Curated annotation (Swiss-Prot):
Coiled coil: none annotated. SUPFAM superfamilies: Metallo-hydrolase/oxidoreductase. Keywords: Hydrolase. It comes from Staphylococcus epidermidis (strain ATCC 35984 / DSM 28319 / BCRC 17069 / CCUG 31568 / BM 3577 / RP62A). PANTHER family: UPF0173 METAL-DEPENDENT HYDROLASE MJ1163, UPF0173 METAL-DEPENDENT HYDROLASE MJ1163-RELATED. It holds the Pfam family Lactamase_B_2. One of its GO terms (molecular function) is hydrolase activity. InterPro entries: Metallo-B-lactamas, RibonucZ/Hydroxyglut_hydro, UPF0173, UPF0173_UPF0282_UlaG_hydrolase. This is UPF0173 metal-dependent hydrolase SERP1270. HAMAP family: UPF0173 (MF_00457). Belongs to the UPF0173 family.
Length: 229
């Protein structure tokens, strides 16, 4: 299986021939190598509603007639205010089967809203992490989150092949907490740091994360690079 990193928290993969993207922050992101005008996707998974994750979901969903998977509140917002036709609302603890595999949403400690041009934020449900099971592999995208001990419970229930974990600090875990989460709680086969160096407030050296992780393998990916397993 091949999973591609495209800056911030954007991940692309294919499962059973279907094209899936997570948190498509493309336009306005000079760390992303994708073109939202030409990208083809069948499914879009959203961890939460902040602009650097919500990103280009409306453009991608409407142009591709893609199905958007995320919190029930977020899906209601997309269908009511942006005319997105294909939405699948879920919540923490829920699992659903799709033709690329299964998606289960798990807890994340963060917030979730979208701020309109007038400065008014819209509540978009709970932030969530994602467990994807596809082609016999298990992927844990933690979403934006702080450290919490139930990461161990999540990994006990779903032994993780690849974990995408934020290291940027300020808004999410930094290197110290992220490496602790990997070493003590999640213990994946492969760890990939995300959500760093997109903005000055989240500048980090991923090599420090790699040095701190003592479990499995750490792969530091540049935008456009992939992990295969």
């Amino acid at each position: 299986m091949k999973l591609s990193f495209h800056g911030q928290s954007t991940i692309y993969f294919e499962g059973n021939g279907k094209k899936v993207i997570v948190d498509p922050f493309i336009s306005g992101n000079d760390k992303c190598d994708l073109d939202e005008q030409t990208l083809e996707v069948d499914y879009i998974i959203l961890t939460h509603g902040h602009a650097d994750h919500f990103g280009d979901v409306v453009e991608l969903a409407n142009r591709n007639h893609a199905t958007v998977i995320g919190s029930a509140e977020l899906q209601g917002y997309l269908s009511t205010y942006h005319g997105v036709e294909n939405v699948h609302g879920m919540n923490i603890g829920g699992k659903a089967k799709f033709d690329f595999g299964t998606v289960k949403f798990v807890q994340a400690f963060h917030s979730s809203s979208f701020t309109h041009d007038n400065g008014v934020p819209v509540y978009l449900g709970m932030p969530m992490g994602i467990i994807v099971e596809a082609e016999g592999k298990t992927i844990y995208h933690t979403g934006d989150t702080g450290l919490f001990s139930d990461m161990k419970l999540i990994a006990d229930r779903h032994p993780v092949d690849v974990c995408f974990v934020p290291i940027g600090d300020n808004f999410t875990m930094g290197i110290e907490d992220a490496s602790y989460a990997i070493n003590e709680f999640i213990k994946p086969t492969i760890s990939v740091p995300i959500h760093y160096n997109t903005f000055p407030l989240i500048e980090q050296d991923p090599e420090q994360f790699k040095d701190a992780v003592q479990v499995g393998e750490v792969q530091i990916l540049k935008p456009g690079e992939s992990v295969e397993f």
